[in-house]
């Protein structure tokens, strides 16, 4: 999966994000579009060198109906972001999947402003339908901090019939921000959907924290081991509270980071490896090298 976009766009390219839509409007700016092409191009080159399938997601986590209205925009922003990434896919020459990124209504790190399940269904239904109409290959619900909102979003995507992944905001204690265990969250969402998520993941968290979370006794269940399949990881072992608003990134060295990622191989179905805050092409290259070293010349599939 792709590595960091947002932090790199700010720190390496000096780009400012929209107050309502964050990165979703960058495709309309020459500098923003060029930076996105360059970052994705670098990640694609790594996937090509190591013969790995590649997943990328539109920078649209904040592009929900409420925020689009506040920005005086429409769902065309979603369609244009999917089309932009689709063009990159067509020119990539690799096995690549275009994901539509969705997110929670409120704060992904604290859970503040999170929606109850039925309200979440109504809130996310429109966004999911926009991605269906735009033709994304799958939907990716990133850093979901609470079970009720994640469940409501899953129900909304369930209605579209699209493939999708739910990625939780998790802590070392093995729970989401609202206190739901990973196991309970997976079991509950699977129980209320006909078109179940392809799998579950976590993102914006260090692999050592994810390992502690998954290793909690109440998460060492058949459903977690079968259904939890990936991580899009931070390079810093700091907690969400410590990371949020940090002036400086706390970055692990690429090789050390890749070693920490591979320790998640204890969990048998973890097969989606991506980067979040602090990662760049060096980190993703070391991860790809580790994956290829582990599997030899075997053709890998998602």
Segments from the language model and where they lie:
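Domain-level signal for soluble alpha/beta catalytic cores
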Residues: 1-302
């Amino acid at each position: 999966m792709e590595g960091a976009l947002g932090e790199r766009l700010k720190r390496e390219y000096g780009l400012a994000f929209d107050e309502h839509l964050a990165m979703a409007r960058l495709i309309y700016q020459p500098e923003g579009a060029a930076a996105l092409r360059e970052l994705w191009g670098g990640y694609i080159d790594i996937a090509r060198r190591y013969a790995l399938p590649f997943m990328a997601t539109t920078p649209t986590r904040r592009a929900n109906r409420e925020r689009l209205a506040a920005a005086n925009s429409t769902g065309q922003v979603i369609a244009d972001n999917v089309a932009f990434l689709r063009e990159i896919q067509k020119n990539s020459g690799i096995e690549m999947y275009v994901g539509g990124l969705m997110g929670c209504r409120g704060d992904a790190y604290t859970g503040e402003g999170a929606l109850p399940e039925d309200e979440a269904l109504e809130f996310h239904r429109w966004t999911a339908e926009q991605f269906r109409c735009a033709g994304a290959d799958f939907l990716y619900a990133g850093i979901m901090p609470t079970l009720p909102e994640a469940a409501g979003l899953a129900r909304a995507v369930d209605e579209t019939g699209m493939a999708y992944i739910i990625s939780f905001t998790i802590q070392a204690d093995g729970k989401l921000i609202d206190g739901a265990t990973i196991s309970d969250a997976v079991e509950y969402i699977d129980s209320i959907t006909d078109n179940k998520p392809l799998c579950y993941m976590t993102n914006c968290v260090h692999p050592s924290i994810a390992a502690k979370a998954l290793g909690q006794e109440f998460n060492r269940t058949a459903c977690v081991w079968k259904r939890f399949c990936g991580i899009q990881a931070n390079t810093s072992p700091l907690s969400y509270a410590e990371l949020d608003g940090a002036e400086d990134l706390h970055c692990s060295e690429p090789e050390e980071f890749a070693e920490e990622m591979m320790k998640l191989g204890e969990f048998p179905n973890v097969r989606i490896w991506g980067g979040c805050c602090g990662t760049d092409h060096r980190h993703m290259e070391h991860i790809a090298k580790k994956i290829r070293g582990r599997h030899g010349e075997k053709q890998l599939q998602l």
